Amino acid sequence: MRSVVVGFTGFCTLVLLTIGLNTTSVQAREDASKPEFYTARVKPIFDTNCARCHGGINHRGGLNIDTRESLLKGGHTGPAIVPGDPSKSLLLTLIRHEGPANDPKNMPPNKSKLSDADIQTVTDWIKAGAIIPAASK
């Protein structure tokens, strides 16, 4: 009888953990689709790693990261992001350092690539539609 109780308890624990993990990943996807996700999670990454060269009055390579429209327009090499499709977003290719080994465009230049967590945050944001609040700059 005791082994049945222990087995049932273990099974229930496994089910609850699985439900909890699935809820967490769904919640993360939902959060990425909200304008607040950009303000709280994405903008700080851009401000720290990108804005010096691609924000404000600086638009190296023709890229301005300050608005969704400017990211959609992109720079001299085309659109920086394709909302809903991270695999077609040049911005992700560059911050992942996935270009050719001698590609000078890996971003940020002359620095290590962004952390996996930061790259995942930007990926989730693009996948969710790359929403930027209208008042954000």
Question: Where in this protein do the model-derived segments appear?
Answer:
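Bacterial N-terminal signal peptides
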Residues: 8-22
